């Protein structure tokens, strides 16, 4: 028996595959899911989502979202999702630097602070996943 993993963004279904294990960056910390996991739902932070298929690891950078587990099916509703091999590292580094520069010029009370902070986290996740 295996898990079905679906990764969906607002733009498209990114992935639908049968896997052995899923590891994801939860809001309360990283966690793993295997066959017959208890049903649950959680918020996701920007970071690395890894799945294992036939003993081989595959990595995605996700920009936050939600994950639901039920009946050996894992559904990821992600703001963004990008396979490690599809990430333009130089573009991600520029996005990280630009967002970090903007963030450093703001106070935490600035209305744009949360959005810039999220951009920094997403860009950092993309760089980390691409470097694997």
Curated annotation (Swiss-Prot):
It is a peripheral membrane protein. InterPro entries: ATP_synth_F1_dsu/esu, ATP_synth_F1_dsu/esu_N, ATP_synth_F1_esu_C, ATPsynth_dsu/esu_N. It is found in: Cell inner membrane. It holds the Pfam family ATP-synt_DE_N. Keywords: ATP synthesis, Cell inner membrane, Cell membrane, CF(1), Hydrogen ion transport, Ion transport, Membrane, Transport. The gene is atpC. This is ATP synthase epsilon chain. Produces ATP from ADP in the presence of a proton gradient across the membrane.
């Amino acid at each position: 028996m295996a898990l079905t993993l679906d990764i969906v963004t607002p733009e498209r279904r990114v992935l639908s595959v049968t896997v052995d294990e899923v590891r994801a960056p939860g809001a309360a910390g990283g966690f793993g899911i295997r066959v017959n996991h208890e049903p649950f739902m959680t918020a996701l932070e920007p970071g690395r989502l890894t799945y294992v298929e036939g003993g081989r690891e595959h990595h995605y950078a996700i920009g936050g979202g939600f994950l639901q587990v039920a009946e050996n099916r894992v559904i990821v509703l992600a703001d963004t999702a990008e396979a490690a091999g599809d990430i333009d590292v130089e573009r991600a580094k520029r996005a990280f630097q630009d967002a970090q520069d903007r963030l450093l010029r703001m106070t935490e009370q600035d209305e744009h602070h949360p959005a810039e902070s999220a951009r920094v986290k997403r860009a950092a996740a993309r760089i980390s996943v691409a470097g694997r």
